């Protein structure tokens, strides 16, 4: 063992050993408990960022800890390689997406290896290869044959800049989440998978996910959006077909004064065809896409269609308005409006001079006032004919029953969740394996003709997908007849919805090898960002149920435990140029002056300009405040970067990047290295004789085993990695001060250092590997995690505080099993206590076992 800790040489040597020994390559082993740990795989953007490093360090710490628990641990890695950034980069760099992607994969793979992550590289794959997406294509055709896939023309969010469809959740403030272009509505044929058929199960099974954060489960519950209500029919004057409406408040039915319909509703389109002004309004509504969350605050706009609906129970005519707050893809695209009891309806009615008829009053019988605002609470019905006096649930049931009896409605369950639109009008994605013959019939591509391969040698013009532009590519045959291929590609969430399962058998000649998949699945620990709560994590749960129902897996859920790591923040600085726009300056190019409290007083960039500090914000390219992990590894070593990442903040909270903190982690690791080196250069140690230890030695050993117990719980159960490291640091402070004079002192230090080195191993595997060897042990990668000695935690002696009239006057060292009488006798005869009791009469003596002797005297 070298005297100086030199991470660069050490880490490369140990990484080569792991590669050569295939340390982390695993196979199924029925004799061992398995543990499958997975971090969300990266998009090969070109370079790792600190968010990646944090995610993958957490996963590696969990994996290495579980391996030392004796489990058969699989930790795979791969590449989420399809997607729009590759197309944009290809246009910018005048290349094709494929070579750009593969070059990035090679570069990032080397970066991951330099950080010492214990991946089973034999399972690596990239989702953009036909060997991967071929099985996705075949599974899609199986879903089609089962009736779970369909194609329909639908109104979609269209980004005119990226020339692609966006999911609702990819629309932010009416603009594309990627390029900030205003989103338009466009009708195009789309492929859908029927996730709605699994909505109830997806909702119910959230209750089985005890290892998931409550916040993620709540977000999914809200996204699925189950509600119980009534679907009812309003007849429409002059129309054969009734207008179907869904409501969760049938108790307010007698207060309906108009019906609102979406701009895309067939009735709206029919009326707009005869009314140019209405047509212009519906077009405006279509192209002003709003997220559901914004409906409450947006300005309510509408226009009378001229059509009249007939109230299903009292026969009253009410106007039908096209309203900008009614969504076509929720419920039926039509709402019954009750202005007196719904604030949105109230604002609309007030604006357009429509009737406001209250029919619900508070349960205490007091009058309801709707002169300024709607009364939205549940209460008791009035002015509702035969339903007067009924409370909410009774009214709900009675009105639903009457509607059903008259054939005008029924109770129903509705979900906010829509079927999953998987078509994308992009090139760099997996081709959808469907063809259309000349008679207009659509067919899945037969399995023996899969994969439908995406051509990689293409030229990108930034506008049209090469497979759409190349008319020859689409030409094919089906059963000997001419046919055209589908030129849309899959939403890239398709690939990431089942990759976790493919890792179990990446070479299988099917989507999965059921035997291997059922050994490894479900994933025991999944690590990734909370931004994926409603898309990737929901789609993966859905895909797992599809795989189960196809007979590939037996489990119901893909991920047992989920850890959502916090973001990595960094200081951001900007300079305002002559045009008044902000130029973001990299923190590494800024010199900082701080006040006594550590706050930034002044910041100057490398050109001598004073720059403004914008605070600690998420690392991003746009703010130029990212820190290159490569530079940090080159400067401090991978172990130091890993240790800082795990120590600086709880794993699920934001982490503030401070180079001073990295320097602190480096100093600590050097102190551990120094103590191990000093200890090992003194030669071998004799066996530890626990029975012969002195009081001080027992106390130190107790600290060692308390630390083992705490670190084991913090990493294994609580996942508070930062407090585990803090406990090891605290122990190291004691070990640095511990005497080394006697043979038993050295034997005790030997036991303690071995425990410290193994406890640090998940965070700092390279340094621990070398120190473990120096301590005379072999291969830390396969050693056992230290177990704490319960006997060592038992204290032989206890310190009892003596209080006289509420003030600390003495401390007693007593045997751990001393009786109350013995403690009282010692306390009342203690030399210090006697001084303060001189001349006083003892009135009361109270003993708190093992802690305190309280004497009251006057």
UniProtKB/Swiss-Prot annotation:
It comes from Aliivibrio salmonicida (strain LFI1238) (Vibrio salmonicida (strain LFI1238)). The gene is leuS. The lineage of its organism: Bacteria, Pseudomonadati, Pseudomonadota, Gammaproteobacteria, Vibrionales. One of its GO terms (cellular component) is cytosol. It is an enzyme of class 6 (ligase). ATP binds at residue 621. Transmembrane segments: none annotated. Its main location: cytoplasm. It holds the Pfam family tRNA-synt_1g. Its EC number is 6.1.1.4. This is Leucine--tRNA ligase.
């Amino acid at each position: 063992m070298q005297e100086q800790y030199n991470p660069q040489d050490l880490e490369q040597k140990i990484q080569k050993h792991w590669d050569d020994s295939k340390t982390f390559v695993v196979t199924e082993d029925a004799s061992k408990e398995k543990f499958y740990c997975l971090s969300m795989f990266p998009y090969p953007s070109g370079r790792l960022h600190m968010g990646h490093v944090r995610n993958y360090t957490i996963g590696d710490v969990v994996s290495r800890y579980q391996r030392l628990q004796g489990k058969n641990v699989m930790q795979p890695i791969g590449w989420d390689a399809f997607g729009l950034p590759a197309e944009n980069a290809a246009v910018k760099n005048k290349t094709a997406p494929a070579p750009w992607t593969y070059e990035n994969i090679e570069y990032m793979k080397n970066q991951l290896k330099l950080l010492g992550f214990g991946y089973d590289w034999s399972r690596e794959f990239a989702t953009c290869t036909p060997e991967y997406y071929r099985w996705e294509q075949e599974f899609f055709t199986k879903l089609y044959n089962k009736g779970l896939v369909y194609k329909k023309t639908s109104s979609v969010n269209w980004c005119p800049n990226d020339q692609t469809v966006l999911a609702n959740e990819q629309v932010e403030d009416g603009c594309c989440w990627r390029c900030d272009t205003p989103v338009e509505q466009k009708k195009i044929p789309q492929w859908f998978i029927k996730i709605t058929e699994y909505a109830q199960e997806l909702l119910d099974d959230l209750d089985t996910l005890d290892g998931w954060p409550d916040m993620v489960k709540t977000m999914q519950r809200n996204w699925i959006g189950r509600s119980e209500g009534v679907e009812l029919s309003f007849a429409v004057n002059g129309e054969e077909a009734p207008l179907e409406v869904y409501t969760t408040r049938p108790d307010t039915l007698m207060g309906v004064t108009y019906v609102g319909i979406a701009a895309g509703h067939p009735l709206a389109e029919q009326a707009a065809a005869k009314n140019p002004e209405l047509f212009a309004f519906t077009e405006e509504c279509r192209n002003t896409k709003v997220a559901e969350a914004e409906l409450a605050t947006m300005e309510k706009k509408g226009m009378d269609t001229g059509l009249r609906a007939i109230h299903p129970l009292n026969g009253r005519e009410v106007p039908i308005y096209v309203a900008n707050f009614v969504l076509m893809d929720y419920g039926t695209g039509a709402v019954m409006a009750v202005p007196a009891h719904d604030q949105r309806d109230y604002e609309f009615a007030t604006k357009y001079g429509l009737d406001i008829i209250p029919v619900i009053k508070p349960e205490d019988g007091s009058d309801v006032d709707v002169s300024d605002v709607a009364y939205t609470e549940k209460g008791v019905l009035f002015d509702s004919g035969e339903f007067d006096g009924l409370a909410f649930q009774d009214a709900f049931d009675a009105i639903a029953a009457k509607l059903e009896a008259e054939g005008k409605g029924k109770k129903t369950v509705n979900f906010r969740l829509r079927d999953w639109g998987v078509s994308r009008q992009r090139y760099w994605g997996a081709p959808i394996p469907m063809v259309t013959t000349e008679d207009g019939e659509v067919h899945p591509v037969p399995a023996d003709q899969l994969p439908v391969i995406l051509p990689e040698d293409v030229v990108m013009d930034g506008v049209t997908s090469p497979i759409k532009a190349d008319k020859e590519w689409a030409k094919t045959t089906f059963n000997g007849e001419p046919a055209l291929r589908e030129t849309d590609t899959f939403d890239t969430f398709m690939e990431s919805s089942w990759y976790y399962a493919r890792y179990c058998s990446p070479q299988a000649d099917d989507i999965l090898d059921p035997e291997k998949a059922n050994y490894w699945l479900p994933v025991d620990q999944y690590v990734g960002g909370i931004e994926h709560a409603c898309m990737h994590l929901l789609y993966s749960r859905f895909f797992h149920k599809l795989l189960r129902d196809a007979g590939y897996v037996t489990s119901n859920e893909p991920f047992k435990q989920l850890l959502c790591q916090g973001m990595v923040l960094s200081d951001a600085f900007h300079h305002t140029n002559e045009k008044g726009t902000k130029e973001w300056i990299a923190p590494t190019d800024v010199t900082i002056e701080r006040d006594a409290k550590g706050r930034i007083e002044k910041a100057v960039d490398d050109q001598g300009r004073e720059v403004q500090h914008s605070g600690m914000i998420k690392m991003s390219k746009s703010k130029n405040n990212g820190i290159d992990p490569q530079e940090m590894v080159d400067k401090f070593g991978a172990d130091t970067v890993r240790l800082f990442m795990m120590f600086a903040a709880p794993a699920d909270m934001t982490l503030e990047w401070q180079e001073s903190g990295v320097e602190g982690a480096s100093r600590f690791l050097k102190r551990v290295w120094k103590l191990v080196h000093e200890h090992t250069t003194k030669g071998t140690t004799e066996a530890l004789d626990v029975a012969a230890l002195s009081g001080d030695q027992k106390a130190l050993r107790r600290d060692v085993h308390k630390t083992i117990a705490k670190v084991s719980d913090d990493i294994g159960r609580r996942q508070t990695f930062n407090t585990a490291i803090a406990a090891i640091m605290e122990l190291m402070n004691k070990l640095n001060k511990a005497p080394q004079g006697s043979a038993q002192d050295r034997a005790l230090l030997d036991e303690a250092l071995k425990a410290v080195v193994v406890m640090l191993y998940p965070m700092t595997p390279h340094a621990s590997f070398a120190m473990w060897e120096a301590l005379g042990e072999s291969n830390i990668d396969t050693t056992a995690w230290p177990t704490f000695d319960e006997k060592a935690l038992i204290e032989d002696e206890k310190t009892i505080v003596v209080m006289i009239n509420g003030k600390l006057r003495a401390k007693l060292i007593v045997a751990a099993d001393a009786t109350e009488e013995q403690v009282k006798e010692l306390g009342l005869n203690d030399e210090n206590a006697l001084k303060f009791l001189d001349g006083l009469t003892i009135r009361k003596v109270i003993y708190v076992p093992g802690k305190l002797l309280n004497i009251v005297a006057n």
